[in-house]
Design a protein with these regions (language model features):
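A short, structured surface patch at a secondary-structure boundary
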Residues: 56, 62-111
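Extracytoplasmic substrate-binding proteins
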Residues: 126-198, 290, 299-325
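Structured C-terminal subdomain patch of bacterial secreted/periplasmic proteins
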Residues: 252-325
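Short helix-initiation/N-cap motifs at beta->coil->alpha
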Residues: 43-45, 98-105, 227-235
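Basic- and aromatic-lined ligand-binding clefts that recognize polyanionic substrates
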Residues: 56-60, 64-68, 166-221, 230
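N-terminal signal peptide c-region/cleavage motif recognized by signal peptidases
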Residues: 20-28
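N-terminal export leaders
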Residues: 6-12
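Proline-aspartate-enriched helix->loop->beta-strand connector
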Residues: 113-119, 135, 240, 244-249
Length: 325
């Protein structure tokens, strides 16, 4: 596929995409003098061949943007999102908004004329459409192999810009911090992780959507894995009280997304308010100040899949375990 296509072909491609018309943009052209060198890299779809040092990169995933930011790589377009503090600079007008984390803005892409598009997670469903517009990488991760997939993503993006040494250094730091947390976690009592969406609560045991707390970071689980409920196990406050966790970890979805009202237009209840009740206070976690409200954006929006998000999340849990001994 051409690394750059004419405005006319871009318009045709975007029109086809917008109306669901199938068909490739065009056949790959032979290499031309002055064409950027290419490299074969790994991504979630397998192997991909892309140009070295792309400059007009559009990123539709916050964990991938985390990698780009950590390695100081060029970004031209981003998804509109609730950014964590360390990524808030991407809300600046110099970065064009190219859609949401789910839906691309094809008119914006036509203006940007990207030479690389990056999708993952929420945006991965648009891979086939976007790949007709520009070379596209899918940097989705599997929670059960999070560090391995994070390593692949860092290696892939670093290799495009000759920053392999920085990528290796970054991942060595991530792996070292994770191992340090696992050593602390081995000495700690089991914990219960829950996701709160307003007043709805679901436990996240090993293998669940956010089970990486146990699967990757080594926190001993209070609940066993339940393969039949990959999105989590529904719970009420009385269920948590009955389990009596020594540690209770909470992810607040609404705090991550900035949601202010529910579907009925009623104000949402912040998790810190929701969990401030006699049932939770009566648990071992409540009595011993071991209710930990995890960084909502780092966990819910980035899934700990970006190296900086992972380092922040590990540091928070380490501090909690050390303080709660």
């Amino acid at each position: 596929m051409k690394l750059m296509i004419s405005r006319r072909r871009m318009a045709l491609a975007l029109t086809a995409a917008a109306w669901g018309i199938s068909g490739a943009v065009g056949a790959a052209a032979p290499a031309q003098p002055g064409q950027p060198a290419q490299i074969s890299v790994q991504h979630a779809k397998g192997q991909a061949t892309v140009a070295l040092k792309p400059q007009r990169v559009v990123v539709y995933d916050l964990a991938a943007l985390d990698v780009m930011h950590a390695l100081q790589l060029p970004v031209a377009g981003v998804a509109k999102a609730e950014y964590p503090d360390y990524l808030k600079s991407y809300a600046d007008a110099k970065y064009q908004v190219a859609g949401s984390l789910f839906i691309p803005d094809y008119e914006a892409l036509s203006r940007i004329r990207p030479d690389l598009i990056v999708v993952a997670g929420r945006s991965a469903a648009k891979y086939d459409v976007l790949a007709k517009i520009a070379p596209t990488l899918d940097l989705s991760v599997d929670g059960k192999n999070l560090l391995g997939d994070m390593q692949r993503n860092v290696d892939t993006l670093a290799s495009l810009y000759g920053k392999q040494a920085q990528g290796r250094q970054l991942m060595a730091k991530v792996r070292g911090e994770v191992e340090g947390l696992k050593a602390l976690a081995a000495q700690a009592e089991p914990g219960l992780l829950v996701l709160a969406v307003n007043t709805s609560i679901s436990a996240q045991p090993p293998g669940a959507r956010f089970g990486l707390l146990h699967d990757v970071l080594g926190i001993k689980p209070l609940l066993a894995a339940d393969a039949s409920k990959p999105r989590g196990v529904p719970m009420k406050m009385e269920d948590i009280a009955r389990l009596d966790p020594a540690w209770l970890y909470v992810i607040d979805r609404n705090a991550a997304t900035g949601t202010q009202t529910d579907k009925q237009g009623q104000p949402v209840i912040a998790s810190k308010q929701l969990f401030d009740n006699a049932q939770i206070q009566g648990t071992r976690a409540g009595r011993n100040a071991r209710v930990v409200f995890l960084d909502p954006k780092g966990w819910y929006l980035l899934g700990s899949a970006g190296p900086t998000a992972m380092l922040h999340n590990v540091a928070q849990i380490k501090a909690a375990l050390q303080a709660g001994k």
